[in-house]
């Protein structure tokens, strides 16, 4: 009881229920990697591996945290992934946890990620850390509380090493907010890391943190994951609380994990998920942890697939990635059918809600970059917003109706390569918005309908840029989507050691 009470004591007052986390992650760590483990190789281990090393007292939280802070000092100016590095508080937290370990018996239980570093997207509040929302004028704005998802990550034992850069207000699928370094793709530094969780993706892909939190309101976890050869999971609507704030975007946005493996994403989802008092919509917790069910065979499934969503088309490289996954699915015995829906009617209402989110931010428009200013200026009236919500809900019913015929849908994450750094800066705001719509059209349907969706790596194109596909599931079918993604991951990558881009290898 003392351990549970200790965990609950770190939570803000508005968090009335904390789900116990009894599952043992030692079953999911990679013992093969431990055989040749060296202290310089932490960045090649998963968050689950690191948690097991701490649990078995092979390394201390302080050693791991210092290692990652050293990598941040060495590489972050290259990739531009962090808006704020918590040099002092991260070390203080790791020292406290190391001291705590020294005073307890080896058999006493620990929170599942005790002493494992994590990064938080700079749209979320971490008490006593800056929260700028990607607005340079707010760089010194200190948060006075923890968001609900942050409180849960702290209670799970994570050490927060900083805040990752986001596109301004989370508005864009690329991360180049004025006044911050752009988030670069660690696999090809001329290209953007995607967005809006671009900093989180760049940090994980470069091995600056083992795992990170992001959020997805139109592809903002899946797009950077696809850009950076990561796993990015957008949970079902209501799976993860947005406490303590309300929701003014009609449930299109949610928190989600960015990681290098599907099992890690499932484990972080187990930490994030669950009702917090007053949530406007919520799902019951699963009977078993996602990290357990993810490793199980999903059975023979009926899958739809599409190489693009009309009215847009995708590049040959993207179509090749989808074809590769289709072949894997056929070899596994899944039933496949080419089928999709048209997203033309979704564009206008989704854009209206996007604009309204900027207008409702409360940040004066002159402090924002030109595209956000234009979005705010054209956000319309409350009636325009409500009509957009109604129309989106009508279209969402059609999307969910389509999904009732299938267990999952396989799609691209985006339609062509990501933009290079600065490639769109010379364009007018309306032209940038049109570019965005054309690029990430496969992502918003899952947000509009509240469906679970995951991006998984498939390989690389001839320019060395990552290729990816997404899997979209039925409402609340998070476990099945994760299990299918894990099955695909095993077929595509096997049990090969985790790799980093060459220049970021230890």
From Swiss-Prot:
<dbReference type="InterPro" id="IPR036928">
    <property type="entry name" value="AS_sf"/>
</dbReference>
<dbReference type="InterPro" id="IPR020556">
    <property type="entry name" value="Amidase_CS"/>
</dbReference>
<feature type="active site" description="Charge relay system">
    <location>
        <position position="121"/>
    </location>
</feature>
<dbReference type="InterPro" id="IPR023631">
    <property type="entry name" value="Amidase_dom"/>
</dbReference>
<keyword id="KW-0378">Hydrolase</keyword>
<protein>
    <recommendedName>
        <fullName>Putative amidase</fullName>
        <ecNumber>3.5.1.4</ecNumber>
    </recommendedName>
</protein>
<feature type="active site" description="Acyl-ester intermediate">
    <location>
        <position position="220"/>
    </location>
</feature>
<dbReference type="InterPro" id="IPR000120">
    <property type="entry name" value="Amidase"/>
</dbReference>
<comment type="similarity">
    <text>Belongs to the amidase family.</text>
</comment>
<dbReference type="GO" id="GO:0004040">
    <property type="term" value="F:amidase activity"/>
</dbReference>
<dbReference type="Pfam" id="PF01425">
    <property type="entry name" value="Amidase"/>
</dbReference>
<feature type="active site" description="Charge relay system">
    <location>
        <position position="196"/>
    </location>
</feature>
């Amino acid at each position: 009881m003392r351990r549970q009470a200790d965990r609950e004591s770190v939570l803000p007052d508005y968090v009335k229920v904390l789900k116990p986390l009894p599952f043992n992650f030692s079953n999911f760590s990679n013992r093969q990697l431990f055989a040749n483990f060296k202290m310089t190789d932490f960045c090649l281990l998963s968050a689950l591996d690191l948690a097991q090393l701490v649990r078995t007292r092979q390394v201390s939280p302080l050693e791991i945290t210092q290692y990652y802070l050293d990598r941040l000092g060495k590489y972050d100016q290259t990739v531009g992934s962090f808006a704020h590095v918590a040099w002092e508080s991260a070390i203080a937290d790791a020292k406290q946890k190391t001291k705590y370990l020294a005073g307890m018996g080896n058999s006493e239980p620990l929170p599942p990620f005790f002493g494992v570093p994590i990064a938080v997207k700079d749209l979320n509040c971490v008490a006593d850390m800056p929260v700028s929302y990607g607005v340079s004028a707010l760089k010194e704005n200190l948060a006075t509380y923890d968001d609900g998802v942050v409180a849960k990550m702290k209670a799970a034992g994570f050490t927060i090493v900083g805040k990752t850069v986001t596109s301004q207000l989370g508005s864009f699928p690329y991360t180049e907010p004025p006044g911050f370094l752009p988030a670069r793709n660690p696999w090809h530094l001329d290209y953007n890391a995607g967005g809006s969780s671009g900093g989180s993706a760049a940090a994980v892909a470069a091995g600056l943190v083992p795992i990170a939190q992001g959020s997805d309101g139109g592809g903002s976890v899946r797009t950077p994951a696809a850009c950076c050869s990561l796993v990015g999971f957008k949970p079902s609507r209501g799976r993860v609380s947005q406490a303590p704030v309300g929701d003014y975007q009609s449930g299109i946005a949610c928190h989600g994990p960015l990681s290098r493996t599907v099992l890690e994403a499932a484990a972080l989802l187990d930490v994030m998920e669950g009702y917090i008092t007053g949530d406007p919509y919520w799902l019951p917790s699963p009977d078993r942890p996602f990290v357990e069910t993810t490793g199980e065979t999903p059975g023979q499934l009926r899958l739809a697939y599409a190489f693009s969503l009309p009215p847009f088309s995708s590049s040959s490289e993207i179509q090749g990635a989808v074809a590769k996954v289709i072949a894997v699915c056929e070899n596994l015995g899944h039933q496949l059918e080419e089928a999709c829906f048209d997203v033309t009617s979704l564009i206008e209402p989704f854009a209206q809600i996007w604009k309204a989110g900027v207008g409702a931010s409360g940040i004066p428009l002159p402090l924002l970059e030109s595209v956000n200013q234009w979005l705010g200026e054209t956000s319309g009236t409350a009636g325009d917003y409500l009509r957009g919500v109604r129309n989106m809900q009508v279209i969402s019913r059609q999307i969910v109706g389509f999904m009732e015929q299938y267990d999952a849908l396989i799609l691209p994450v985006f339609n062509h390569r990501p933009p290079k750094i600065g490639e769109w800066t010379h364009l007018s705001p309306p032209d940038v918005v049109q570019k965005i719509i054309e690029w990430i059209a496969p992502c918003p349907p899952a947000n509009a309908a509240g469906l679970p969706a995951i991006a998984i790596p498939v390989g690389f194109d001839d320019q060395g840029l990552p290729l990816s596909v997404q899997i979209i599931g039925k409402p609340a079918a998070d476990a099945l989507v994760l299990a299918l993604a894990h099955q695909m991951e095993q077929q595509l990558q096997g049990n090969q050691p985790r790799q980093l881009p060459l220049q970021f290898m230890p």
